[in-house]
Amino acid sequence: MESPIEVVRRFCAAWSNDTPADELAAFFTEDAVYHNIPLEPVSGRENIVRTIASFIRPGPPGIEGIEFRVINIAADGPVVMTERVDAFKLPDRSFELPVMGTFEVTDGKISAWRDYFDMNQFTSRMG
């Protein structure tokens, strides 16, 4: 079985390769929790997929793609922490956002994902 770091590396690479939300679902446990810390948490694989699909969509004002650039990654057992720069591609521009992510991996699947970032920075860059 893959180590928790390997699971998270593959997940970040899948985002960077524009993997569709329904395919990203395979990375999560059925009862996973996804929490962009400035927002409310999302529980359950299907709800996570719907959330991802709602903000990765072509055309204005949607986000056409996000590349997860992992700067540093570390694990303590099943908990993996990533220091990232997420590069957002919009129809008319792109921007980068520093992010700290914490993942919990259970039996080779992501059971919790928390991203910490500056919401003011994100909204100002989205326009």
PLM segments and residue spans:
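A solvent-exposed, acidic/Ser-Thr-rich amphipathic alpha-helical stretch
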Residues: 21-78
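Short beta-strand segments that buttress and anchor functional surface loops
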Residues: 82-90
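Hydrophobic/aromatic beta-strand elements that line small-molecule binding cavities or substrate pockets
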Residues: 52, 68-73, 85-86, 98-104
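Short solvent-exposed loop/turn micro-motifs enriched in small/polar/acidic residues
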Residues: 64-66, 94-97
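Short beta-strand edge/turn micro-motifs at domain boundaries
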Residues: 98-124
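Short acidic-aromatic low-complexity motifs
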Residues: 1-30
